[in-house]
Amino acid sequence: MAIRKYKPTTPGRRGSSVSDFAEITRDHPEKSLVRPLHGRGGRNAHGRITTRHKGGGHKRAYRVIDFRRHDKDGVNAKVAHIEYDPNRTANIALLHYLDGEKRYIIAPQGLKQGAIVESGANADIKPGNNLPLRNIPAGTLVHAVELRPGGGAKMARSAGASIQLLGKEGSYASLRMPSGEIRRVDVRCRATVGEVGNAEQANINWGKAGRMRWKGKRPTVRGVVMNPVDHPHGGGEGKTSGGRHPVSPWGKPEGRTRKPKKASDKLIVRRRRTGKKR
């Protein structure tokens, strides 16, 4: 993938860029693997906003991705197409299995149309193959990693993401996460070899607010420019700093949003670097 930059023909085009989609081999999805996707606008069943800054955006169809490939162990598949997925930053690969079934997976870096991929404990160590961590050599970069055996891929699924397998000791494997955190995971958990493709996506300059609205992202308004009725930082004459430590619209101090005593924390060997004092 490469980035195509626009000439500054308008203020919105100045500095903006877009993917050249050179890796994409088909412009429409597999019909049997598409489901309707209804926008919620960040609202719950009562109609109240529970997630801010969401709403609108272009209509999308959901592509069903296979995050549990254990039921295809020993069945080879051919990469029929590399496709664009509007629901994620990574591209997706359409697999045609020898038994006739078709499935989507996240497309790793270097996976080409016509390649053969497989899953299972005896699979080769090459991009796109899925196998348990116990069968992957230390130092290998992987993605789409399970947190629990059979639970489906949860970690490192976005464009350019990868996890490094540092080593194995007993029934646990040590992984270096994209955040820098080192975590222990059961060696029976599965992972896909290689890095997620489309890494240049992070370098796209969106150029104008309208492109964010196409993606379903609404504006983020600072509390200091609101009225006192809307935010604890609101009000004041002229430009003010808020007059207190940063808080949420409901008065809770910023940061420290994670559960302090999560059960799985005992599997974290080294925490991610946050730059904040704990």
UniProtKB/Swiss-Prot annotation:
GO biological process terms, alphabetically, are: cytoplasmic translation
Q: Which UniProt keywords apply?
A: Ribonucleoprotein, Ribosomal protein, RNA-binding, rRNA-binding
Q: What NCBIfam families does the record tag this protein with?
A: rplB_bact (TIGR01171)
- Renumbered to this chain, the Basic and acidic residues biased-composition regions fall at 23-33, 253-268
Q: What does this protein do?
A: One of the primary rRNA binding proteins. Required for association of the 30S and 50S subunits to form the 70S ribosome, for tRNA binding and peptide bond formation. It has been suggested to have peptidyltransferase activity; this is somewhat controversial. Makes several contacts with the 16S rRNA in the 70S ribosome.
Keyword rRNA-binding, does the record have it?
A: yes
Record bears the keyword 4Fe-4S? no
| UniProt-recorded Gene Ontology molecular function terms | rRNA binding; structural constituent of ribosome; transferase activity
Q: Which PANTHER family match?
A: LARGE RIBOSOMAL SUBUNIT PROTEIN UL2M, RIBOSOMAL PROTEIN L2
Q: Under what name is this protein listed?
A: Large ribosomal subunit protein uL2
HAMAP family attached to this UniProt entry: Ribosomal_uL2_B
Chain residue ranges for the region called Disordered: 1-58, 224-278
- Tell me which family the UniProt entry assigns to this protein: Belongs to the universal ribosomal protein uL2 family.
- Subunit structure as annotated in this protein's UniProt entry: Part of the 50S ribosomal subunit. Forms a bridge to the 30S subunit in the 70S ribosome.
The protein's superkingdom reads Bacteria
Gene Ontology CC: large ribosomal subunit
User: Which Pfam families did the record assign?
Assistant: Ribosomal_L2, Ribosomal_L2_C
Composition bias (Basic residues) maps to 37-58, 269-278
